[in-house]
Amino acid sequence: PASVRTAEISNWTGKAVAGPRSQLELILQRGESKKPGIYFLTGINSETGKPRVYIGEAEVIRSRMRNHLNRDFWKTVIFFVSKDENLTKAHTKYLEGKLIEMTKAADRFELENTNASGSHLPESDAADMDVFLAKVEQIKCA
């Protein structure tokens, strides 16, 4: 789709915002882009035809997205933030690390990330982020 889309799940604190690269400025004008979160930049490798992805995290999505304008491969962005302001840097690094691990294990994408990430969280925070991650996967696959 060539427009900006959002997604939420009932009783979940997260929110997704997605759209094509051509709509990036419109996406970055949204209030959600001022929050910490995780994001995916996706495209297709023109030589192999295989999907490519870069997985990242940021304290301010908007600022980090502008840093990726020099990466030519991506055509679509989707990012996830918390509606209740409860995602911390440690949370986003934990989520990023888990998502990179999952993507490597699935072996369906060419992963653009060169550095692994991750963060150790207290057990209760890790459990909360695993629930958040399950919802991210649910929306991403929809």
Where on the chain are the PLM-derived regions?
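Boundary/linker segments flanking structured domains
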Residues: 1-36, 44-51, 61-142
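Conserved catalytic cores of phosphodiester-cleaving nucleases, focusing on short active-site segments
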Residues: 54-56
